Amino acid sequence: MAAGSASSLGGGAWPGSEAGDFLARYRQVSNKLKKRFLRKPNVAEAGEQFAQLARELRAQECLPYAAWCQLAVARCQQALFHGPGEALALTEAARLFLRQECDARQRLGCPAAYGEPLQAAASALGAAVRLHLELGQPAAAAALCLELAAALRAVGQPAAAAGHFQRAAQLHLPLMPLAALQALGDAASCQLLARDYTGALALFTRMQRLAREHGGHPVQQLELLPQPPSGPQPPLSGPQPRPVLGSTLPLPQPPDHAPGSVAPSPGTLGAFADVLVRCEVSRVLLLLLLQPPPAKLLPEHAQTLEKYSWEAFDGHGQDTSGQLPEELFLLLQSLVMAAQEKDTEGIKKLQVEMWPLLTAEQNHLLHLVLQETISPSGQGV
């Protein structure tokens, strides 16, 4: 191409000569894919030429045209029944569309072409995800879901991003539960950005349940298994001596640290414990914000609020399923009491004390709780 075609292509206005140059090359390669009598089209060669044209257009910042060339590469790879190559070309096309959208928003402050590049990117990445799943690569599929979700969140579409974060969590859960919990946490944050507080509460509740299921310490489970006796093993042939009972049982431990106990501190891994703390605090704040009527209060939400009532206070500040530090638990308990009594001044004082203990997201929820207490809407938020 001529050197001046870069600016004209990047700006979206094509004089006839530059347009003819690109279109002539594109049509020339496309003609090689047409079926002719007694001649088989050379699909591999056409795919390589489309890829070369895409690289040239990308170097000239002609992003949408480079993306369309990558889609042509994907069609060639599909004709060759090469799934990995097709997925790679679709992913590259989607990234070019996303880059076009981000550049347009930075320069113009509005979506490019009424958001069509964003829709094209979502479609291409969705096809790539399906291909990776067909190839038995759920981790790669989840990574693409996370990439699309992060892009949607960056361009101001948190509601759409939340769905892709949840799909990534679903793909990660069987093999990487901690990554799945992180994706669910991102989805919950997107729900909060979209002001879908009911959906965020449901996600935090699900996260808490999954963290308890997958966060058990493996050492505790191993302690419950019989231990082989020390020393040389007897030969396999002949009668085997019966092992002594004392050699197969774990050593006695204090009641608070017995194997299989429900005490969370030694039994939950640190990362999962952090997830439990975040979910517990966020769920309490969301329940205070939404103020669901008793008829619509789910049992798990009712149990959460009951833990912070004075009647359930057991002298240690929390039950055995909690992970909160005692100071934070007592402050949350006071906050629940103040919110139930509509004590605005008490909530303001607690907000000052709780501010350094909460995340920015949780502090925003606490601010919304205070605003709802000052100016109640009658229906939560």
From Swiss-Prot:
Transmembrane regions listed in the UniProt entry: none
UniProt keywords, alphabetically: Acetylation, Cytoplasm, Endosome, Nucleus
Motif (Nuclear localization signal): 34-36
Gene Ontology CC entries for this record: cytoplasm; early endosome; nuclear body; nucleus
Record-linked InterPro entries: F8A, TPR-like_helical_dom_sf
SS bond partners: none
UniProt function note: RAB5A effector molecule that is involved in vesicular trafficking of early endosomes. Mediates the recruitment of HTT by RAB5A onto early endosomes. The HTT-F8A1/F8A2/F8A3-RAB5A complex stimulates early endosomal interaction with actin filaments and inhibits interaction with microtubules, leading to the reduction of endosome motility.
Name of the molecule in the record: 40-kDa huntingtin-associated protein
Underlying gene: F8a1
